[in-house]
Each structure stands twice: as C-alpha cells, then as structure tokens.
A protein has these predicted regions:
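Generic beta-sheet signal
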Residues: 3-5, 57-61, 85
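Conserved beta-strand scaffold positions in the cores of enzyme catalytic domains, especially
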Residues: 27-29, 85-87, 133-136
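Alpha-helical elements of Rossmann-like donor-binding domains used by nucleotide-donor carbohydrate transfer enzymes
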Residues: 47-48, 73, 117, 121
Length: 150
C-alpha cells in the first residue's frame, strides 16, 4: 500500500533534511521548492502526487503545510488512491528556524516575513484532520532527529 507523508512545520525547521535521512530511498520527494516560479503550483503538486500514487509509489510532501487548507487536498488525493496518510509535525521554534535560515544560501533563504506569516497560520495536525498516523519530530542535539508517535 502506498503512503503519503505530509511534513508540517516552519521553513528551516529540518523537514528537507529529515526527508533525506528518513525517506529518500523509499519515497518520491514532492516539494513546491522544485518549481518555485511555476504558475498553479498547488495544482501541479496535486497532479504529481496523483501520478506517483497511480504508479503505486509512496510520496513525501515536503512543504510548510501549515494548515488544513494545504493538507486536506493532499489527504483527499491519497484517499482516492487507497494510500495511508502520515503527518510529521515539526513544532515551531522560530529562533532555531531563523538561525538555520540565516545559514542558507541567498538562493534558498526565506525572508523573515515569510517565517512570521507561516508561524501565524501554523496549526498542529490531529487525527480528526484525516491522518492515519501522526508523529512529532525534534532535534536530538547531536545532528539527528527524535521521532515520537502522536
């Protein structure tokens, strides 16, 4: 059974690094960062998700996904294709995200206003939102991650 993993958290919260370390060998990486200047980015992402699921492939959606407005359409596509849906919540740490963001290249750095806008909309997901499984992800203090169910 295919799986759709939805990463939820601020920019520079470790989501892409977590993907590379945890899912890169088994899941398709789907991120709007791959097509930053494209028109209709949401529609394109949903189309790519649909195509991957039709091929029986599991997918990680690596965006901020701060609210049901972003994750509900993803969950609906997953359900239509019989896929499980897992959410990985990266609790907000604005100061830590700002520090990591400042170390990014100019090309990938997000303006602080972008972090604040996402923080304002960011909501912790729940099972009532349609997720089959939910996990909380944090840093382990040694360059890795700690993942806890719930």
């Amino acid at each position: 059974m295919a799986e759709v993993v939805i990463l939820i958290g601020l920019q520079a919260s470790g989501k892409s690094t977590f993907f590379r370390r945890t899912f890169a060998g088994t899941h398709v990486h789907l991120s709007k960062d791959h097509f930053p200047n494209a028109k209709r980015r949401q529609e394109r992402q949903l189309r790519m998700l649909t195509e991957a699921l039709e091929e029986g492939r599991s997918v990680v959606v690596d965006n901020t996904n701060p609210s049901p407005e972003e994750w509900t359409p993803l969950i609906e596509v997953a359900r239509r294709h019989g896929a499980r849906v897992s959410g990985y919540w990266f609790p907000p740490d604005l100061e830590g995200s700002q520090e990591r963001n400042a170390r990014r290249s100019a090309k990938t750095r997000v303006p602080d206003v972008g972090l604040y806008a996402t923080l304002k909309r960011l909501r912790r997901p729940s099972a009532e939102d349609g997720f089959d499984e939910l996990y909380t992800v944090g840093f382990d203090g040694e360059g890795g991650f700690v993942v806890e169910r719930g």
